[in-house]
Amino acid sequence: MAKAKFERTKPHVNIGTIGHIDHGKTTLTAAITKVLHDQNPDINPYTPFEQIDKAPEERARGITISIAHVEYQTEKRHYAHVDCPGHADYIKNMITGAAQMDGAILVVSAADGPMPQTKEHVLLARQVGVPYIVVALNKADVVDDEEILQLVELEVRELLNSYEFPGDDVPVVRVSALKALEGDPKWTQSILDLLKACDDYIPEPVREIDKPFLMPIEDVFTITGRGTVVTGRVERGVVKVGDEVEIVGIHPKTLKTTVTGVEMFRKLLDEGRAGDNIGVLLRGIKREEVERGQVVCKPGSITPHTEFEAQVYVLSKDEGGRHTPFFNNYRPQFYFRTTDVTGVVHLPEGTEMVMPGDNTEMRVELIQPIAMEEGLRFAIREGGRTVGAGRVTKILK
């Protein structure tokens, strides 16, 4: 195969390994880097198992998570790949979105088939919106019986179907991460087949800049003679002078206005783009009509809501979370983007209480509306300290 040269023009995709403990997620991650390194050492460093397994701890929204980041390139793409050593780390990562995934490689041991954590990870992938799954049927070298391999594959497809993934269409690739690490040509090829499945099956993600404009408001002030300016970091999309925008959230009524100026570091610009910290001058808006916690966005692209369902991770005592459980009708602050709003928690039927360190589903009613959509992340706070992290899974009202 001809050597792929490193070009920043390759599309970038975020990916990760998920699945039951000891089914070989970390070994597979190491094998991918080794096979690609052997094929093309100039652009692909080899990351050994030990290095991935001893992933450094990161803090995301006050939660400690061990995540290993590796990167590699196929001919078509540049991948950033995350692997978490511990089961709890996976759950925390998926709920807090410390590392976003455009697709996941579900690792299932061919010798054991789907296990409890396999199910839990697939369910979480569904709830936190991991859009595509590719299956690596690992340890396929130790299963001699073709019928058993077919049975396990069928089981995995049924499991994916039961969580609303297209189980019949998902690529299932038989691999042996260990044999590939040892350099066995048959199993080295299996890793390349798996990567081809990722290249072909996981679509290129829509870049933030191509999405509809949205900027959370951090600050509001008045420029005498010019009007009201709101500042913040553009979350997605592009805003240009002359664009019509809406101001959504907190207040009962959504306001429509026009952008009369965009500035960055006190310089006037034609436009602000995703990632920029900017000030936006708004026509005919009074200082008291807007506040921190609202968003400025493309008209009709997002709506205000007060009631939603969420998947939440509750910080353990060691992470600085609560020392005691909470019960139904718990009333903490929900921190969305730039502001706190009080809300009431309704626990699922049959759940008496939630302990620190648990993950749970809940229904929340906020006392003020927030501009939200499915997938929006938030923190749960008490008196300014974070006690949980969650993600909106369904909007109710």
Curated annotation (Swiss-Prot):
PROSITE patterns for this protein: G_TR_1 (PS00301), G_TR_2 (PS51722)
Stretch list, region G2: 62-66
MF-aspect GO terms: GTP binding; GTPase activity; translation elongation factor activity
Chain sites annotated for binding GTP: 19-26, 83-87, 138-141
Listed CDD domains: EF_Tu (cd01884), EFTU_II (cd03697), EFTU_III (cd03707)
Stretches for region G1: 19-26
Region G5: start-end pairs: 176-178
Residue ranges of the region described as G4: 138-141
Alphabetical keyword list: Cytoplasm, Elongation factor, GTP-binding, Hydrolase, Magnesium, Metal-binding, Nucleotide-binding, Protein biosynthesis
Any one Gene Ontology cellular component term annotated for this protein: cytosol
NCBIfam families: EF-Tu (TIGR00485), PRK00049.1 (NF000766), PRK12735.1 (NF009372), PRK12736.1 (NF009373), small_GTP (TIGR00231)
PANTHER family linked to this entry: ELONGATION FACTOR TU, MITOCHONDRIAL (PTHR43721:SF22), ELONGATION FACTOR TU-RELATED (PTHR43721)
Assembly description: Monomer.
Entry's family note: Belongs to the TRAFAC class translation factor GTPase superfamily. Classic translation factor GTPase family. EF-Tu/EF-1A subfamily.
Protein name: Elongation factor Tu
Protein species of origin: Acidothermus cellulolyticus (strain ATCC 43068 / DSM 8971 / 11B)
